[in-house]
């Protein structure tokens, strides 16, 4: 059995790490490179860096941040936000990232998934899914809809359909974020996570809502996630990655030991 991965997520805006609740009221919490180094030294398995306004602002990729991170940490990291073309993917990977995450761009142009997988390998392509709970309908039978542009734009895409389609197109991994749970620290959306994790054959990273180590244990066991994204619970010093991993190990969840 593969070890479950613990992945800090750094939302970046104008070159600074920020954190909000449900993608709103973001506050500055530090330099992304310094924070990346700290989490690397703490025992993170990977790190995710998202430029949270690059797509909505139609800006370029934060390549300067990517290059500085690559010189500082020695674990895999992925980059998302503002990646719209194969050239963007190539630039990010050449700057030092192991993976690229596409979200809004993939909804608008699904072929970018297959093109990226063919050019760089599926292992490099992460589909970011921002999901909101809605009333089930003929169009969205799962009751979960894909939203883009930082949660501001609905798509009419059913989350389960989109996950299966992305897998078919060649995505190597899914990062599944619940907009409803994001930043609340009330726990992950377990039903959503289990629905996607048990329907696709590629790894699923659960995102949105982590507040305690118990929440991670729940999403990794009950939600069947392969990895858990964390932000607020470590950004504000409430828990350390070492403490989280020790808790998971004590509760029978296999993790990479870094203590």
Swiss-Prot record:
Segments passing through the bilayer: none
GO process annotations (BP): L-histidine biosynthetic process
Pathway membership: Amino-acid biosynthesis; L-histidine biosynthesis; L-histidine from 5-phospho-alpha-D-ribose 1-diphosphate: step 5/9
Alphabetical UniProt keywords: Amino-acid biosynthesis, Cytoplasm, Histidine biosynthesis, Lyase
Subcellular location: Cytoplasm
Gene Ontology CC: one annotated term: cytoplasm
A UniProt-annotated Pfam family: His_biosynth
Predominant location category: cytoplasm
EC number: 4.3.2.10
GO molecular function, one term: lyase activity
UniProt key word Phosphoprotein: no
Residues forming the catalytic site: 11, 130
Reactions it catalyzes: 5-[(5-phospho-1-deoxy-D-ribulos-1-ylimino)methylamino]-1-(5-phospho-beta-D-ribosyl)imidazole-4-carboxamide + L-glutamine = D-erythro-1-(imidazol-4-yl)glycerol 3-phosphate + 5-amino-1-(5-phospho-beta-D-ribosyl)imidazole-4-carboxamide + L-glutamate + H(+)
Family, as annotated: Belongs to the HisA/HisF family.
Subunit structure: Heterodimer of HisH and HisF.
Function: IGPS catalyzes the conversion of PRFAR and glutamine to IGP, AICAR and glutamate. The HisF subunit catalyzes the cyclization activity that produces IGP and AICAR from PRFAR using the ammonia provided by the HisH subunit.
Protein name: Imidazole glycerol phosphate synthase subunit HisF
The species this protein was found in: Syntrophobacter fumaroxidans (strain DSM 10017 / MPOB)
Gene designation per UniProt: hisF
């Amino acid at each position: 059995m593969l070890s479950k991965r613990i992945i800090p997520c750094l939302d970046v805006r104008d070159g600074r790490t920020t954190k909000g609740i449900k993608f709103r009221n973001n506050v500055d919490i530090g330099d992304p490179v310094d924070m990346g180094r700290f989490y690397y030294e703490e025992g993170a398995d990977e790190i995710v860096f998202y430029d949270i306004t690059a797509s909505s602002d139609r800006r370029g990729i934060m390549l300067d941040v990517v290059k500085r991170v690559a010189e500082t940490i020695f674990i895999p990291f992925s980059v998302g936000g503002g990646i719209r073309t194969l050239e963007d993917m190539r630039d990010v990977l050449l700057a030092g990232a192991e993976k690229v995450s596409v979200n809004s761009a993939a909804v608008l142009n699904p072929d970018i998934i297959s093109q990226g997988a063919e050019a760089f390998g599926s292992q490099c392509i992460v589909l970011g899914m921002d999901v909101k709970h809605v009333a089930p309908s003929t169009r969205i039978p799962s009751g979960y809809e894909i939203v883009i542009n930082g949660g501001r734009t609905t798509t009419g895409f059913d989350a389960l359909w989109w996950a299966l389609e992305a897998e078919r197109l060649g995505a190597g991994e899914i990062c599944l974020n619940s907009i409803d749970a994001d930043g609340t620290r009330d726990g992950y959306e377990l039903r959503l996570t289990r629905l996607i994790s048990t329907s696709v054959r590629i790894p699923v990273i659960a995102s949105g809502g982590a507040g305690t180590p118990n929440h991670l244990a729940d999403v990794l066991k009950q939600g069947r996630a392969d990895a858990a994204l964390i932000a607020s619970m470590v950004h504000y010093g409430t828990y350390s990655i070492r403490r989280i991993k020790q808790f998971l190990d004590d509760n029978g969840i296999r993790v990479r030991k870094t203590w």
